[in-house]
Amino acid sequence: MGKNITVLGAGAWGTAFGQVLADAGNTVTMWAKEQQIVEGIRDHHHNAVRLPSVEKLPDNMTATGDRAEAVKNADIVVVAIAAQFARVALVEFKGLIPDHAIVVSLMKGIERGTNKRMDEVVRESLDLPADRFAAISGPNLSKEIADRHPAATVVACTNLDNATKVAEACTTSYFKPFVTTDVIGLEMCGSLKNVTALAVGMARGAGYGENTAAMIETRGLAELTALGVAAGADPKTFFGLAGVGDLIATCGSSLSRNYTFGANLGKGLTVEEATKVSNGVAEGVPTTDAVVALGDQLDVPTPLAYQMSRVLNEGISCSEMLAGLFGHEVTGE
């Protein structure tokens, strides 16, 4: 039997995932602040602002701008808000979400200022126990999923039964979720790969080829794995869908906002210029400095994140970024 599921945030990924949930037989309510988006989904089953490629969203999707109305009957509440605004937005929902509901994060990022993962931000904001929090991450480019292309993802929760409940709620003929208890690993994969995607995109935009891209991706994977393990993650997570899988998709597609943002930097645009032409939030931009700070906190070197931080804050070129990745001494891989 289908569940009542609320999605907080009607951006491209939130809306695409709402469609997955509706296709899986659930009753889906989208919450958004923008009245135009609410009316579009509720009255016309169309999100012309954030996901115009889908001409008609399923009939079992609706929308509201009222927080209490959005979550009052929810069995599952999915959070799809820009990572750096999650804490402020979620505080408004504290006390409104039913005590039995599982809260699921689609967000990927490290909070600036606190260096906290999204599982920590969500649980603190809502005063939520660990067994009622789940995260979803994987190679999930929103437009392809909106077009119902075959895809897979990973659902993480410390309570495997609750992870399975969430996975069952989003299983369709084209969308296959797997489950894990490694919340930390999943969160770290989803956040840190965005920094790597910025760097790969920048290299591509600057005209570099496959060798350079492969170098950045593999060294980025090593960096994010080391950070994750230091934070308590299972290293195997980084070599599955949430790690390597997401890295491949995010670092190889113009549909990735982080890749595209980096490519624009590589072509010579400033951070301000690249931001203006971006369609949506490139989470890797605010996450980069947080990753460097997290590396300092965990005593893990983060040369790629550090060099991308210099790109974003000092305006160094792609060639300077790449030159700074490695020291002069020969080391083991």
Swiss-Prot record:
* GO molecular function term, any single one: NAD binding
Question: Which PROSITE patterns does this one have?
Answer: NAD_G3PDH
* EC number from the UniProt entry: 1.1.1.94
Q: What is its main location?
A: cytoplasm
**One cellular component term from this protein's GO annotations in UniProt:** cytosol
Kindly give the Pfam families that the UniProt entry links to this protein: NAD_Gly3P_dh_C, NAD_Gly3P_dh_N
Give GO terms for biological process.
Answer: carbohydrate metabolic process; glycerol-3-phosphate biosynthetic process; glycerol-3-phosphate catabolic process; glycerophospholipid metabolic process; phospholipid biosynthetic process
Is ATP-binding included in the keywords of this UniProt record?
Answer: no
- Name its cellular compartments: Cytoplasm
In terms of domain of life, where is this protein from?
Bacteria
Q: Where does sn-glycerol 3-phosphate bind?
A: K108, G138, K193, D246, S256, R257, N258
Indicate whether Lipid biosynthesis appears among the record's keywords: yes
Tell me the pathway: Membrane lipid metabolism; glycerophospholipid metabolism
The residues that the entry says bind NADPH are W13, K33, K108, S142, R257, V281, E283
**Which residue positions are annotated as catalytic?**
K193 (proton acceptor)
Record field: catalytic activity: sn-glycerol 3-phosphate + NAD(+) = dihydroxyacetone phosphate + NADH + H(+); sn-glycerol 3-phosphate + NADP(+) = dihydroxyacetone phosphate + NADPH + H(+)
Keywords tagged on the record: Cytoplasm, Lipid biosynthesis, Lipid metabolism, NAD, NADP, Nucleotide-binding, Oxidoreductase, Phospholipid biosynthesis, Phospholipid metabolism
Q: What does this protein do?
A: Catalyzes the reduction of the glycolytic intermediate dihydroxyacetone phosphate (DHAP) to sn-glycerol 3-phosphate (G3P), the key precursor for phospholipid synthesis.
**What HAMAP family does its record include?**
NAD_Glyc3P_dehydrog
Q: Which family does it belong to?
A: Belongs to the NAD-dependent glycerol-3-phosphate dehydrogenase family.
PANTHER family for the chain = GLYCEROL-3-PHOSPHATE DEHYDROGENASE (PTHR11728), GLYCEROL-3-PHOSPHATE DEHYDROGENASE [NAD(+)] 2, CHLOROPLASTIC (PTHR11728:SF1)
Name of the protein this chain belongs to: Glycerol-3-phosphate dehydrogenase [NAD(P)+]
